Amino acid sequence: MPQPSRPRKGSMGFSPRKRAESEVPRIRSWASNDGAPGVQGFAGYKAGMTQVLMVNDEANSPREGMEEAVPVTVVETPPMRAVALRAYEDTPYGSKPLTEVWGREFDTSLERTLDLPNEDTFEDDAAALRDDAETGDIDDVRLITHTLPAGMRNIPKKTPDVMETRVGGGTLTDRVEFGLDLISDGGEHEISDIFRAGEYLDAAGVTKGKGTQGPVKRFGVQKRKGKHARQGYRRRIGNLGPWNPSRVRSTVPQQGQTGYHQRTELNKRLIEIGNGDEPTVDGGFVGYGEVDGPYALIKGSLPGPDQRLLRFRTAVRPSDQPRLDPEVRYVSTASNQG
């Protein structure tokens, strides 16, 4: 009988499979942007899923120009605020923060999570940052942004989610000026200022937590068959490894934490950006409620349960860019409750 040969069950690229440290996803890499300076990311809260009827605009597709049903995730995207600009310098040990410039106005809910400055030092700090940019002492700039969940009736919390978002495009001096102008004007920005319907983006979020699970569900190993199953166990692996080396290797699939991991999905297509209650299904989204404000429709599913924070960035590995502004003819409002 030939020996079966196949790749191992379960990817080692996701090790260690432990709980995420924070529900605010951490973005470690950003796309290079050669256009005008601008913010490269945004965030929203997952509401649920529905489907739309849209015209297939994929070039050279056999169904090009035909109407088709597409599943979409509805994400509520209220405006965000930028409160500070942080400058980084490259060192042999990675990028390190060099200086910060804080704005003048802050939302009252921000005091729940940050120690805000008591004095207005914006002009002096901004002048020092401009000098550092001209002399080449800094290599990158990022905005400290936050959400405003206190004004959302479907998000049961008042504490904003704080995150860093890169400023891309133009020269470093252009990016510094863009960031300073943004925070001096209050820092409010919307998803339509960053993305356009039809383009690709990357979505990051923390997946649904499933607690402790066995190796069959956690890694996808096969259940025991035949006489091996009649030994009393079907959902256990056959052994923990060889006699030598006399230890259990980390590659052995075992039971443990499943879910509540940060995952980033690449090249999710933004179908529509809107404002209002058009995508709200009859009776509201289960576990969320009604969407009545700025929203985005993303093709396909996204990680995490309803009400989970999702972060978006400009695509770092974009494939062939599809056509912008796709034609959406109908958004289904059929109830999720049957």
From Swiss-Prot:
Gene Ontology terms, MF aspect: rRNA binding; structural constituent of ribosome
Gene3D superfamilies: 3.30.1430.10, Ribosomal protein L3, domain 3, Translation factors
UniProt-listed GO biological process terms: translation
Claim: Ribosomal protein is one of the keywords in the record: yes
A GO CC term attached to the entry: cytosolic large ribosomal subunit
Keywords for the protein's UniProt record, in alphabetical order: Ribonucleoprotein, Ribosomal protein, RNA-binding, rRNA-binding
InterPro entries, sorted: L3_arc_euk, Ribosomal_L3_dom_3_arc_sf, Ribosomal_uL3, Ribosomal_uL3_arc, Ribosomal_uL3_CS, Transl_B-barrel_sf
Record carries keyword rRNA-binding: yes
Annotated segments matching region Disordered: 1-37
Function: One of the primary rRNA binding proteins, it binds directly near the 3'-end of the 23S rRNA, where it nucleates assembly of the 50S subunit.
Subunit structure: Part of the 50S ribosomal subunit. Forms a cluster with proteins L14 and L24e.
Similarity comment text for this entry: Belongs to the universal ribosomal protein uL3 family.
Protein name: Large ribosomal subunit protein uL3
Native organism: Haloquadratum walsbyi (strain DSM 16790 / HBSQ001)
